[in-house]
């Protein structure tokens, strides 16, 4: 999906093409999507930010127009550490050594890892509608498991989830898209939905998304356990949907206060995909936070 006024391109990182779109002038902002979306999720937000910033919206490896390599046995090529390295290389390719990072869902987890691994690069971090990966796994109970069942389904050994999803990818991914609290089909722009469907009908994307969750339950959890005493130092916006399942199951601000030294909290009365429900309000909150931490 093309954004008006944005230029599409790719950067090759260790043999993997990472797709992105860029526009605007001013302090750089990297925007990263989550599951099961791609960079199209920012279509109604990025143009507003580009009036004041250089905005880069990229696809994570395994998603959208980025390459979708076969997962390695140790899952390292789908770890958040690798995702973060990919995106750092995109920004350095564009000439940005330091930048703001806005991440929803898996993009937020990628941002958390980047802020730990490359603190010199991240001017500010925005994490959208998540708690840290470690907290998700360590605090799973019957309510969390019932709401976030896909975390445990997608991590099952190949080819079980790939085969099941592949029978009807629209049904599976749309169950996720419309099932995580206060979101309905009319909240999503039709062009954006078309971009998501085109992506997730690709068997390689199905494998990529499963690999992402397999990595989270193994190598990412190992990395997070090793870094449990470390905190993010940059200004961090904790932004979530107050009517979503994450906001109802967790004290999201409290969880991030354990992992970050400088947090600001914001919420909108939506679900997990509050960006789609409230694009104008999302843009306004982001612009104010970025201006304060420019």
From Swiss-Prot:
Active site (record annotation): 105 (nucleophile), 272 (proton donor)
SUPFAM superfamilies, per database record: alpha/beta-Hydrolases
Source domain of life: Bacteria
UniProt keyword list: Hydrolase, Plasmid
InterPro entries the record matches: AB_hydrolase_1 (IPR000073), AB_hydrolase_fold (IPR029058), AB_hydrolase_sf (IPR050266), Epox_hydrolase-like (IPR000639)
E.C. code: 3.8.1.3
Keyword Hydrolase part of the UniProt annotation: yes
Residue ranges annotated for the AB hydrolase-1 domain, each copy included: 27-277
A GO term from the CC aspect: membrane
Entry GO MF terms: haloacetate dehalogenase activity
Enzyme class: hydrolase
Reaction(s) catalysed by this chain's protein: a haloacetate + H2O = a halide anion + glycolate + H(+)
Protein family (similarity comment): Belongs to the AB hydrolase superfamily. Epoxide hydrolase family.
PANTHER family linked to this entry: HYDROLASE, PUTATIVE (AFU_ORTHOLOGUE AFUA_2G14860)-RELATED, MONOACYLGLYCEROL LIPASE
Miscellaneous section: Two haloacetate dehalogenase enzymes exist in Moraxella strain B. DehH1 acts predominantly on fluoroacetate, dehH2 acts on chloro-, bromo- and iodoacetate, but not on fluoroacetate.
Protein name per UniProt: Haloacetate dehalogenase H-1
Annotated organism of origin: Moraxella sp. (strain B)
Gene: dehH1
């Amino acid at each position: 999906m093309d954004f008006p006024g944005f230029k599409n391109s790719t950067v090759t990182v260790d043999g993997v093409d990472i797709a992105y779109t860029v526009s605007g002038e001013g302090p750089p902002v990297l925007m990263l999507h989550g599951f099961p979306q791609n960079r199209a999720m920012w279509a109604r937000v990025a143009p507003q930010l580009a009036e004041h910033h250089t905005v880069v919206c990229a696809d994570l490896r395994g998603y959208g127009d980025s390459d979708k390599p076969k997962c390695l046995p140790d899952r390292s090529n789908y770890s958040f550490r690798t995702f973060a390295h990919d995106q750092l290389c995109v920004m350095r390719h564009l000439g940005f050594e330091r930048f703001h990072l806005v991440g929803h869902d898996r993009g937020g987890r990628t941002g958390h890892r980047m802020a730990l691994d490359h603190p010199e690069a991240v001017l500010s971090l925005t994490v959208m509608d998540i708690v840290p990966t470690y907290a998700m796994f360590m605090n799973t109970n019957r309510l969390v498991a019932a709401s976030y069942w896909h975390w445990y389904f997608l991590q099952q050994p190949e080819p079980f989830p790939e085969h099941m999803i592949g029978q009807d990818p629209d049904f599976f991914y749309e169950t996720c898209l419309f099932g995580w609290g206060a979101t309905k089909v009319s909240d999503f722009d039709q062009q954006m939905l078309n971009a998501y469907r085109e992506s997730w009908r690709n068997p390689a994307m199905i494998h990529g998304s499963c690999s992402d969750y397999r990595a989270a339950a193994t190598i990412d959890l190992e990395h997070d356990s090793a870094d449990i005493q470390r905190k993010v130092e940059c200004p961090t916006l904790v932004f979530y949907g107050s009517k979503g399942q994450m906001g109802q199951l967790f004290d999201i601000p409290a969880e991030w206060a354990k992992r970050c030294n400088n947090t600001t909290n914001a919420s909108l009365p939506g679900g997990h995909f509050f960006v789609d429900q409230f694009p104008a309000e999302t843009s306004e909150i982001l612009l104010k936070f970025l201006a304060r931490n420019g």
